[in-house]
Amino acid sequence: MAEPLAVDPTGLSAAAAKLAGLVFPQPPAPIAVSGTDSVVAAINETMPSIESLVSDGLPGVKAALTRTASNMNAAADVYAKTDQSLGTSLSQYAFGSSGEGLAGVASVGGQPSQATQLLSTPVSQVTTQLGETAAELAPRVVATVPQLVQLAPHAVQMSQNASPIAQTISQTAQQAAQSAQGGSGPMPAQLASAEKPATEQAEPVHEVTNDDQGDQGDVQPAEVVAAARDEGAGASPGQQPGGGVPAQAMDTGAGARPAASPLAAPVDPSTPAPSTTTTL
């Protein structure tokens, strides 16, 4: 758990004073070796560069420490003044241990100011309200999470089912485009004419059968006439069947009359029919 931020202005001021009171020793005198050999010459050449690091850098270190101590004192002063100002401002509303403020602080018109009304609300009451609100929302959040988890597989399944449909539509569109470009595709099915009902376009089966039978009935008498002519070849006209009467006028029933020719005179119904019996 993180500790609350707290600044001790008194301790900060004491640390700044201790830092500013540090005393640094004086740098030693430069070292010089007398002699003429090569070792003496090397020492006299190397030592000044080493000593200069201390002698030249020590004043800068002292100045930096002094500046840091001064900044620490300034920060401690700022913290102290800010704490005092906040304490004075809060003391005007007389905050106590219970968190209640004075209700007697009023505005110029005699009505409590908005700040007084806000500050007069107990802190414990606000905390209680927040806790109750969080307790009411917790069950709803807990109940919503499982529903979202259950709906996730359905969403994935729907996306998978939609993929084949999209592929089918794409293939159909490509086939239609290829048929339009090639110009040699299957002819579309022709719909029934809107002017003629479907019942009239389709001829009933029994009507077709009757028409076929009627055609066969028309052809059959002609065949009978041809056979009769073949059998009666070489016979006398009186002995030939039909006696020159058209085949349509022949009848095997007793008392039947030959059909009248369109050019023949009308026959009286009361006149008896001539006999067509042939004597052998």
From Swiss-Prot:
Region of interest (Disordered), residue spans: 167-280
Post-translational modification: Phosphorylated at Ser-70.
Note: Elicits a prominent immune response in human tuberculosis patients. Contains several epitopes, particularly in the C-terminal region.
GO CC term (a single one): extracellular region
Primary role: Could be involved in regulation of growth and intracellular survival.
Swiss-Prot/TrEMBL keywords: Phosphoprotein, Secreted, Virulence
Biased segments, Low complexity type: 167-181, 246-280
Subunit structure: Residues 76-280 interact with EsxB and an artificial EsxB-EsxA heterodimer.
Originating organism: Mycobacterium tuberculosis (strain ATCC 25618 / H37Rv)
Major place of residence: secreted
Keyword Secreted: yes
Induction line: Induced during stationary phase.
Gene inactivation effect: Inactivation does not abolish EsxA (ESAT-6) secretion, EsxA-specific immunogenicity and enhanced virulence. Deletion mutants multiply more efficiently compared to wild-type strains.
Residues that bear Phosphoserine: S70
Subcellular location: Secreted
Name of the protein this chain belongs to: ESX-1 secretion-associated protein EspJ
